[in-house]
Amino acid sequence: MGMRFLKNEKGFTGLEAAIVLIAFVTVAAVFSYVLLGAGFFATQKGQETVHTGVKQATSSMELVGSIVAKGSTTNDNITEVTFTLQLAAGGQPIDLNKTVITVLVPKDGDFVELSYESNSSSLDKASEYYVNWIYSLQGSSPDNYLEEFEKAEVTVYLDSTGAGLDINPNDDFIIEVKPPIGATYPIELKAPPSIDSMMVLLK
């Protein structure tokens, strides 16, 4: 018996098959491009997050030289502490105007936060720390940034003429330097057994 084609029946031609195949390939290509783009974006964001995390976890500064303290032999306490800071290797410039120094005395549970001041004539010893620029890239007109090769000599005033802290012989105390970016730099100190007018403190 011969085959008969019913009226209105249509065959699936080679041209139609090619069009469908091209459509599938185009959609697959676009989908792959979107996925690859999302993958590259996620990778970039991941790298930025890791880089930011490393910067936040790493201290940008370090101590240079000795930590020197002045004391009152009358009141038997430390009156001020001076130390010098510089950038750590590979550290980013630090805006000292946004850097806070906290002094803690665990024995008494006392602490005070101090802000930056480089003008001795307007210094408020109770709420500010003083910075004397030993070396600045700007010469005699330093800005507020601690940059590579620069050295900033920091003085904090501790007794009743300053922050109002009473640090006596053998007392432990901590000076924390908190930059706007990077980890806090803690300096753990101990007052000597005997208070002198001038002392070198050990970490």
Curated annotation (Swiss-Prot):
Residues 1-11 form a propeptide. Keywords: Archaeal flagellum. Its main location: other. GO terms for biological process: archaeal or bacterial-type flagellum-dependent cell motility. Belongs to the archaeal flagellin family. Flagellin is the subunit protein which polymerizes to form the filaments of archaeal flagella. PANTHER family: FLAGELLIN B1 (PTHR35903:SF1). This is Probable flagellin 1.
